[in-house]
């Protein structure tokens, strides 16, 4: 592929930034040479009840993986996100809520949020929820979900937020794993004009006899829709709030006590309950939010994620609120009621920072200029990308069309397990290359290793590992530390293995090439699926592409590409040939697709992740081995892809 262009830091950005190039270099150097000194200083950004004396106590030795930060200090996360802001910014907006329906919105100040959190914390105590108990939150994107999270943190309960798109079976599995005592939900969720039967899903989940740990369901009224009611088990959120006291002293928590569990899919077996603790996580979420997004007091910050994912935890709730920011909470989807929704929300609420996913960017890009029709966009100062590698074509469209070539893009790489951003540009310090996550954040020491675990120097490609701990790192998998060690520390000993492949260029910039299990081996050549997808999407007629490997008699693996075309483009054999030649030209003959299947849509979770597992099964004709597809945003897409695949096989028979 052609050399990536470098977009230097704009002088006006460098002049006003929190972190210019010299500051980045000095801070990064200190953070890796003297992590104790660096993090001791950075930890002062939050309020401690009992100051810590110990900073970093960590071991990546696979016989004794142990991660502790600020272990003898005490604090309360809820107090750091609310109480400490009341004097200075009690009347500032903490949350701007934008409903699925554009006519619905709510503004909540820090003082109001503090009162609601205190009331609900008392309500939870009244339901026998205490320090160390697990509370499952299965809610739509409404302010009450944030209230529930902060109320748990206030009393020392551990929250487990389960994305509202998950099926009753998936919900039950997560409740069983953490032995949840209370489930907080809503009558229904609303998303993209459709209703989701959340309470009914909870009822179904609890028919599993192994969910007997659950004593109460607290139900928030979102739509007023009809729901089944269990007299001695179910309680209305609103009834609890009416009688609860608005005074609730925050519980003093040890820095290494659990704050939350968040379940993420394992490549095999049951979901992994990623465990994050209190002190290090909050320090890291707050620092990364401030420095990566160059956040200034009074700005409106919008992360489009759902609180059911780690991005919502760290960059809608904890990071922004710890920093006293105004955070926008969006219930809906980027294309409802139409594709201009994102740009309309930006203008309506004068959003300064927009942090979204490549899948949303590509959806807007497929509609071209129509996505920003009538938009002003002048409030925007910074753009961000999260969730998967962003292909250069989408990056350029985002930069030019949404950011008007004046907003830097922070292309962030991190994981549920990392707690916060690990590799990203800093707007005032880092020149940008479309598609590259660029350089490590403070305290993060990335490296590339070969399949034997040997470190690779210079410009190279390999397995991405992190050589030392950082405060936001997950401490374990809930109830299964052995699996934590096996998953992250056994593959390459003494290192945290991310599961991702990456390329490092001659400038030391990192390019994420995709999950290692998404790496193709074609005739002995390693190729990341992201690289081929980026080449395909760079074609003017392609909106989206997903690449999977299929068995090939000669090459070992063949390249199978699902392609979604831009609006108004007709599929044809001629276009199929054109796209194959295009990829040959962009990457080389070795990357030429063996099969291109037209796809009106791709199977995605509601957070926008493409489910490549399903695409692999369809490509190899394993239609009966697709597993649970209930968590997909549009399960109907799957049958369409199966039908198309069958028709292609018939045509070639």
Curated annotation (Swiss-Prot):
PTM entry text: Acetylated. Deacetylation by the SIR2-homolog deacetylase activates the enzyme.
Reactions performed catalytically: acetate + ATP + CoA = acetyl-CoA + AMP + diphosphate
Any one GO cellular component localisation term in the record: cytosol
A biological process from GO: acetyl-CoA biosynthetic process from acetate
EC number of this enzyme: 6.2.1.1
GO terms of molecular function: acetate-CoA ligase activity; AMP binding; ATP binding; metal ion binding
Modified residues (N6-acetyllysine): 609
Residues reported to bind Mg(2+): 537, 539, 542
Positions contributing to ATP binding: 387-389, 411-416, 500, 515, 526
Cofactor: Mg(2+)
Residues that bind CoA: 191-194, 311, 335, 523, 584
InterPro entries xrefs: Ac_CoA_lig, ACAS_N, AMP-bd_C, AMP-bd_C_sf, AMP-binding_CS, AMP-dep_synth/lig_dom, ANL_N_sf
Keyword entries, A-Z: Acetylation, ATP-binding, Ligase, Magnesium, Metal-binding, Nucleotide-binding
Family: Belongs to the ATP-dependent AMP-binding enzyme family.
Xref: HAMAP family: Ac_CoA_synth (MF_01123)
Annotated function: Catalyzes the conversion of acetate into acetyl-CoA (AcCoA), an essential intermediate at the junction of anabolic and catabolic pathways. AcsA undergoes a two-step reaction. In the first half reaction, AcsA combines acetate with ATP to form acetyl-adenylate (AcAMP) intermediate. In the second half reaction, it can then transfer the acetyl group from AcAMP to the sulfhydryl group of CoA, forming the product AcCoA.
Annotated protein name in UniProt: Acetyl-coenzyme A synthetase 1
Organism whose genome encodes this protein: Pseudomonas putida (strain ATCC 47054 / DSM 6125 / CFBP 8728 / NCIMB 11950 / KT2440)
Underlying gene: acsA1
């Amino acid at each position: 592929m052609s050399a990536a262009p470098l977009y230097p830091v704009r002088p006006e950005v460098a002049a006003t930034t929190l972190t210019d190039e010299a500051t980045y270099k000095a801070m990064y150097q200190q953070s890796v040479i003297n992590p104790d000194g660096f993090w001791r200083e950075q930890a002062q950004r939050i309020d401690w009840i009992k100051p810590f004396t110990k900073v970093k106590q960590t071991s990546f030795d696979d016989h004794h993986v142990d991660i502790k930060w600020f272990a003898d200090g005490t604090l309360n996360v809820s107090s750091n996100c609310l109480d400490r802001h009341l004097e200075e910014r009690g009347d500032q907006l903490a949350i701007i809520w934008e409903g699925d329906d554009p006519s619905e919105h709510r503004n909540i100040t820090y003082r109001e949020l503090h009162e609601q959190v205190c009331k609900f914390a008392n309500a939870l105590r009244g339901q026998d929820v205490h320090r160390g108990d697990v509370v499952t939150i299965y809610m739509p994107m409404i302010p009450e979900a944030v209230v529930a999270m902060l109320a748990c943190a206030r009393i020392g309960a551990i929250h487990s937020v389960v994305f509202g798109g998950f099926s009753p079976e998936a919900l039950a599995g997560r409740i069983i794993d953490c032995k949840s005592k209370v489930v907080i939900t809503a009558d229904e969720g609303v998303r993209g004009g459709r209703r989701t039967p959340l309470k009914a899903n909870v009822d179904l989940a609890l028919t599993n006899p192994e969910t007997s740990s659950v004593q109460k369901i607290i139900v928030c009224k979102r739509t007023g829709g009809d729901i089944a009611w269990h007299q001695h088990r179910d309680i209305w959120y609103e009834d609890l709030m009416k009688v609860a006291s608005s005074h609730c002293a925050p519980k003093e928590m040890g820095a290494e006590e659990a704050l939350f569990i968040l379940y993420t899919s394992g490549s095999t077996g049951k979901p992994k309950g990623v465990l994050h603790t209190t002190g290090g996580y909050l320090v890291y979420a707050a620092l990364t939010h401030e420095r990566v997004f160059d956040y200034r007091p009074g700005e409106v910050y919008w992360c489009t994620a759902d609180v059911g994912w780690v991005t919502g935890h760290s960059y809608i709730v904890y990071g922004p609120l710890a920093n006293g920011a105004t955070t926008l909470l969006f219930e809906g989807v980027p294309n409802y009621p139409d594709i201009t929704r994102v740009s309309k929300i930006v203008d309506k609420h004068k959003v300064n920072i927009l942090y979204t996913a490549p899948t949303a960017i590509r959806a807007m890009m497929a509609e071209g200029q129509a996505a920003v029709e009538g938009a002003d966009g002048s409030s925007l100062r910074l753009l961000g990308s999260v969730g998967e590698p962003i292909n250069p074509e989408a990056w350029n469209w985002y930069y030019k069309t949404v950011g008007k070539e004046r907003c830097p893009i922070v292309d962030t790489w991190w994981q549920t397990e990392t707690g916060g951003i690990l590799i990203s540009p800093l707007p005032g310090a880092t020149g940008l290359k479309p598609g590259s996550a660029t350089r490590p954040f403070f305290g993060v020491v990335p490296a590339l290793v070969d399949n034997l675990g040997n470190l690779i120097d210079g410009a190279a490609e390999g397995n991405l590992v992190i050589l030392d701990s950082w405060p936001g790192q997950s401490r374990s998998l809930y109830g299964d530390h052995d699996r934590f060690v096996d998953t992250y520390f056994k593959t390459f000993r003494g290192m945290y293995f991310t599961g991702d492949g990456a390329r490092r260029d001659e400038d030391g910039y990192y390019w994420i090439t995709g999950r290692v299990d998404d790496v193709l081996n074609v005739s002995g050549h390693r190729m990341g699926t992201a690289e081929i997808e980026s080449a395909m999407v760079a074609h003017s007629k392609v909106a989206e592409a997903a690449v999977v490997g299929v068995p090939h008699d000669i090459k070992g693996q063949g390249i199978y590409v699902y392609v979604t075309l831009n609006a108004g483009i007709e599929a044809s054999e001629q276009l199929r040939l054109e796209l194959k030649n295009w990829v040959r030209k962009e990457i080389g003959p070795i990357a030429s697709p063996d099969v291109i299947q037209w796809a009106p849509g791709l199977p995605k979770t509601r957070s926008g992740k493409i489910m490549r597992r399903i695409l692999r099964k369809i490509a190899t004709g394993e239609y009966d081995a697709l597993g649970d597809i209930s968590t997909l945003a549009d399960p109907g897409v799957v049958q369409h892809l199966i039908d198309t695949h069958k028709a292609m096989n018939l045509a070639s028979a």
